[in-house]
């Protein structure tokens, strides 16, 4: 699924570790806004989180963990 910049999305962050922060199993429905598609393998998106998690406000999330809000 292709998401556009400024699109509101829901994220399943359970089990992901980003910049030393591990998201617990309960973080399956975080809200965010797509900033841009990121080049990576697997493909993903740079997302601005609605709420900061342990100081993280922007994170890269694999495409399979993103869905429309």
Question: Residue spans of the language-model regions?
Answer:
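Basic/aromatic-rich interaction segments and small domains that mediate binding to polyanionic partners
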Residues: 2-69
């Amino acid at each position: 699924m292709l998401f556009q910049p400024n699109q509101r999305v829901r994220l399943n962050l359970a089990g992901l570790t980003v910049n030393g922060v591990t998201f617990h199993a309960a973080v399956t429905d975080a809200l965010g806004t797509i900033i841009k598609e990121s080049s990576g393998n697997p493909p993903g998106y740079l997302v601005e989180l609605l709420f900061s998690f342990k100081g993280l406000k922007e994170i890269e999330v694999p495409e399979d963990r993103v869905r429309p809000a």
